[in-house]
């Protein structure tokens, strides 16, 4: 993050604009809207500045720039067509520790001004960090079309209710659930837009007096295979509404950065053969947090119902009467194969695909004879440590040694690495890779050279 987004309280505070043209006028409108006590300095002014001065809205200082104009200022803007003058204003402000914006010169400025969507008191600011103002403007226009004009009225009304809501609901969780109900209530929003006081009062009383469900809930969310762009929209909504997020090591930092900032985060870092927190304890964490009335998200890499032990966790919740739901995710097999240019099925090479755990525990022998058959694709999850055994067993049961194989490490991430070869090389290839990795075996791997789009980017 190159810039910290902040909202400045400028009401009745001295601000300076140097420049008297059209660009300076646009900046002046923003400062006047914010209630600043504005002084504008220039050699000449367009008529709008004169009109504002005549109305007593700002002060004009005609003539060359004088650094003393900054002495009482909180904030300054250099908006002339003279680069040297703009630089001088910026340096003078910097020496006084005053924030200064230099129009069209972000590197010379100590702050930049975003594109603004104004639904006062709700404000949305969009910035490209000064690199692409046109892109920021296009995004602002798109957001303008998505945010109803009456949104500001809803926000203002919520401010009026805050005291009563704080008295009515004892805990932060109860208040948040109330506000969520209020903000998605279409009838209230329409009544505010129409200024229908009777309907506003009726709807508000109904929402406040409606009993809240004090039970917590758990949502099992699949985070996908790594790339944050592959997180589903519903998954994103759930992690941004969560009070607690319980996650493991397969969830990327990019996805965790999307979690609501004030949510509690509980790391239970699981990987093959090692559990930072035992599965039974994870089950109890979910149960314990939900019993406190919290909204809990269990965030798992890939899909929670494919080798994620999601079913075991939900059984514990079900037995305790805790409400739960599941948001599927893109499983590693689908994501890793797509980002490696390997179609899992193909008319000529594979009519089926098998997803297999590589945890070859004692007493859990796989059906190697069927796995060695042609016209299918095998995908081994967590199979890196057992690659030599997988190679030996498949060859023993008749799979040709020249069968194409690939191992995908950190699939779909920018650090993705893929190596391929033949089945006779699988054990050796696995020694070159690190976890998390996925093993893909089948004729479809031979299409990788032609279809490998991701690494070519």
From Swiss-Prot:
Keywords: Cobalamin biosynthesis, Lyase, Methyltransferase, Multifunctional enzyme, NAD, Oxidoreductase, Phosphoprotein, Porphyrin biosynthesis, S-adenosyl-L-methionine, Transferase. Pathway: Cofactor biosynthesis; adenosylcobalamin biosynthesis; precorrin-2 from uroporphyrinogen III: step 1/1; Cofactor biosynthesis; adenosylcobalamin biosynthesis; sirohydrochlorin from precorrin-2: step 1/1; Porphyrin-containing compound metabolism; siroheme biosynthesis; precorrin-2 from uroporphyrinogen III: step 1/1; Porphyrin-containing compound metabolism; siroheme biosynthesis; siroheme from sirohydrochlorin: step 1/1. S-adenosyl-L-methionine binds at residues 225, 301-303, 306, 331-332, 382, 411. It comes from Escherichia coli O6:K15:H31 (strain 536 / UPEC). SUPFAM superfamilies: NAD(P)-binding Rossmann-fold domains, Siroheme synthase middle domains-like, Tetrapyrrole methylase. Gene3D superfamilies: Cobalt-precorrin-4 Transmethylase, Domain 1, Methyltransferase, Cobalt-precorrin-4 Transmethylase, Domain 2, NAD(P)-binding Rossmann-like Domain, Sirohaem synthase, dimerisation domain, Siroheme synthase, domain 2. The keyword Metal-binding does not apply. This is Siroheme synthase. In the N-terminal section; belongs to the precorrin-2 dehydrogenase / sirohydrochlorin ferrochelatase family. PROSITE patterns: SUMT_1 (PS00839), SUMT_2 (PS00840). NAD(+) binds at residues 22-23, 43-44. It catalyses: uroporphyrinogen III + 2 S-adenosyl-L-methionine = precorrin-2 + 2 S-adenosyl-L-homocysteine + H(+); precorrin-2 + NAD(+) = sirohydrochlorin + NADH + 2 H(+); siroheme + 2 H(+) = sirohydrochlorin + Fe(2+). The modification Phosphoserine is found at residue 128.
């Amino acid at each position: 993050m190159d810039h910290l987004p902040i909202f400045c309280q400028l009401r009745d505070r001295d601000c300076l604009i140097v420049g008297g043209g059209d660009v300076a006028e646009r900046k002046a409108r923003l400062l006047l809207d914010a209630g600043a006590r504005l002084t504008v300095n220039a050699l000449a002014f367009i008529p709008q500045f004169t009109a504002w001065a005549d109305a007593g809205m700002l002060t004009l200082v005609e003539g060359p720039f004088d650094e003393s104009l900054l002495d009482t200022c909180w904030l300054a803007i250099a908006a002339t067509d003279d680069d040297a003058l703009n630089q001088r204003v910026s340096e003078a402000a910097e020496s006084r520790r005053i924030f200064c914006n230099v129009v069209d010169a972000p590197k010379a400025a100590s702050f930049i001004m975003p594109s603004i969507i104004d639904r006062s008191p709700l404000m949305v600011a969009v910035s490209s960090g000064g690199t692409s103002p046109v892109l920021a403007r296009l995004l602002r226009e798109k957001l303008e079309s998505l945010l109803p004009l009456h949104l500001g009225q809803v926000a203002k009304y919520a401010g009026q209710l805050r005291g009563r809501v704080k008295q009515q609901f004892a805990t932060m969780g109860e208040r948040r659930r109330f506000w969520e109900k209020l903000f998605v209530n279409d009838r209230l929003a329409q009544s505010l837009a129409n200024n229908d006081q009777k309907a506003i009062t009726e709807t508000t009383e109904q929402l406040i007096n409606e009993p809240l469900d004090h039970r917590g809930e758990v949502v099992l969310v699949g985070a996908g295979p790594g790339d944050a762009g592959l997180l589903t929209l519903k998954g994103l909504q759930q992690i941004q509404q969560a009070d607690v997020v319980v996650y493991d090591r397969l969830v990327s930092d990019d996805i965790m950065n999307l979690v609501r900032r004030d949510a509690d985060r509980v790391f239970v870092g699981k990987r093959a053969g090692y559990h930072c927190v035992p599965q039974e304890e994870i089950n109890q964490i979910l149960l314990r947090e939900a019993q406190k009335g919290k909204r809990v998200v269990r965030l798992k890499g890939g899909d929670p119902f494919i080798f994620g032990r999601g079913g075991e966790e939900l059984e514990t919740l079900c037995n305790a009467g805790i409400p739960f739901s599941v948001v599927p995710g893109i499983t590693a097999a689908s994501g890793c194969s797509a980002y490696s240019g390997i179609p899992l099925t193909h008319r000529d090479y594979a009519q089926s695909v098998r997803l297999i755990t590589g945890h070859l525990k004692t007493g859990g022998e796989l059906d190697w004879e069927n796995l060695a058959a042609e016209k299918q694709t095998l995908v081994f999850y967590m199979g890196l440590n057992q690659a030599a055994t997988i190679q030996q067993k498949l060859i023993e049961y008749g799979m040709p040694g020249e069968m194409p194989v690939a191992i995908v490490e950190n699939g779909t991430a920018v650090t993705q690495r893929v190596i391929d070869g033949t089945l006779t090389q699988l054990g050796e290839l696995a020694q070159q890779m690190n976890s998390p990795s996925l093993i893909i075996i089948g004729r479809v791997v031979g299409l990788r050279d032609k279809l490998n789009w991701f690494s070519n980017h």
